[in-house]
Structures are given as structure tokens and as C-alpha cells.
Amino acid sequence: MLISQIKGSNGEIIVAVRNGPGDIAKAVVNGGSVYKLAMEAADGGKSLASVIEARGLGEAIDLEKVYAEGRFLPPITHPDAAHLHLTGTGLTHLGSAATRDSMHKKTTEAAEETLTDSMKMFKMGIEGGKPKEGEKGVQPEWFYKGNGYGAAAPGAALVSPSFALDGGEEPEMAGIYVIAKDGTPFRIGFALSNEFSDHVTERINYLYLAHSKLRPASFGPEIRIGTAPDDIRGTSRIKRGDKVIFEKPFLSGEANMSHTFANLEYHHFKYGLFRAPGDVHVHMFGTATLSFAEGIKPEAGDVFEIEVAEFGLPLRNSLAVAAEETVAVRQL
């Protein structure tokens, strides 16, 4: 089942669901919001599908028309945007067979002291990212991106700050979670995401990684309820006007990863800070495909498009650059 949120004519949230790509979406009767439905399921010991079924479905919704009209909202929002957390992890994907062979060769043949920190982290994932049942795997790279104020709706612009040196896409899968009143994390499902980052800043010094990730992100338009397919294959492209300036396949799913989703989830939610009742988490799981690696420099007005057939409509966002702001701290 695919679930999304749409802005109604009076500013209300309309929750839309459909069984899969190609099916007609329908509004959930008195849905309220995906957050409201998910919290009812989490706190009531029910599945999200059963909560939706109990509400019933109403009018049909043309999602392509909604997209064209710019009425998609992020597929989950929180009544208080500060309680939606955007986070991510990286160095989790094997990439293509050639990339995998190359990285294996580098990590197995090179002396430990000659490996970069990134390569060491990748090697740790290869060796310990998929633990046996009942065991804990190695912890991955982790970073903070922001909160709900940094969540750009599908179809909206990803706004790069004026001081940024780059604004580039990262096509990823994101896990979508709510925290029940007893502190238990519940996964709604997975969505396409663009973990928009400043790769030039990151490249200056890896200690700038934290700075480079403090950028908006977008996810959706639809959440695929349930577990993720083992082998996820999609396409990432960038359009400049009528021209496609970058297009490349990207892979995800555990068949193409050095970690299990469960291991990555554990190392996020093991922190009590991230199990505050009522909070929402959007956790992005990394990628092996970047236009930056191909020498592409996106410009204002370019459109990022990420698509995977099983996850519904593609995720599209344009690139915009914010005007310079004067920021000065004042003494009270």
C-alpha cells in the first residue's frame, strides 16, 4: 500500500492511499493526517492498514494532477515541526559489481594504516554490518540533517543556503517512523528521498561532513507501507530545462548494502533521545550514486528526479539558492 498527503482547498490535510503503482488513489475518510493514523495504530496495537480500513475510503484522487498543481505535502508531517527528525547514515551501499570489487580489493590488500577513515568505515560494514540473529552489528556513520522545518515537499524547491559551495542530490531510501506513547519505535514503511548535501564542503575536510549535511531534504511523494524489497533498482536524473544532464541507475535494498536495515535502525534508536513518545523520524540509508562523482555541478532551476517503480510517483525537486542573510547575535 502507498500512502501520501495532499493539501486540501481549505488548507487541510487529505490522506490518500492506493494499493500500488498504477492503481487509483482514494482519500481516507476523516484521515486527519498520516501522523494521526500512524499514532493511532502504534498506541492501539493495530496495523496501519487496519486503521485505514476502519476509516474507509472516499473520493478518487488524481495524484498526477495533484503533483502538477503543487499540492503534495511531505508524506508525513508533525503538528510541531521541531518533533520531526531528519537524520541519515552513509557508507552503507556496495554499489555496482565493479565498485564492490574495487573497494574489496582496496580494503583487503591495503595496509590498515593506509586506509582512509571512510574506507575503514566501509570495511567495518562489510565485516560486521549484517549480524546474525540476536547479535548486534557494527555501528555505521551517522549524521543529523535537521527537523521538520527542513523537510521540502515533493515538487517544492530544495533551497541551498547562500554560503553553500555546492547543492547536490543523494538518491536514497528513507525509513519513516513514529514513536508510540510507551517509547517503542514503529516503522510505517519506506520512501524515496533526496538527502540533499554540499559535497564540495564535505570534500575540503571530512570533519566538515556535519556542516555539509545541514541542508533541506525531501522524501516521498508516497510511503510504501511495510518492509522494503531486498533488491531496489531505480534511476536518478537531473534535468536542466528540456535537457537531461545526468541520468544513472541507483541500487538499494539489503542485497546491495553492507548493512541490514535492522542494524541501521538499531544504531539510531538505541539512543533514548530518539525514542521520545510522539516524535517522527525520517532516517535516510545512504547511496552509491551521486552526480557529483561524475563532475556535475547543479545550477539553480535544475530539477532532481528520483524514481523506483515500486515506490509510486517519482520524487521531483528543483534547486534554488537562498539570498544572503546577515546573521548577528545580540546581547540581552
Language model feature labels by segment:
Residues 18-22, 101, 206-208, 299:
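Short, solvent-exposed amphipathic alpha-helical segments in soluble enzyme
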Residues 22-23, 172, 312:
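Structural motif
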Residues 16-19, 87, 176-178, 320:
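Short beta-strand-to-turn element immediately C-terminal to the catalytic PLP-Schiff-base lysine
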Residues 29, 96, 309:
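Surface loops and adjacent helix of pleckstrin homology
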Residues 6, 43-242:
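Active-site microenvironments in enzyme catalytic cores
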Residues 7-12, 191-193, 197-332:
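Catalytic-pocket segment enriched in acidic/His residues
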Residues 2-54:
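Gly/serine-rich nucleotide phosphate-binding loop at the start of the catalytic core
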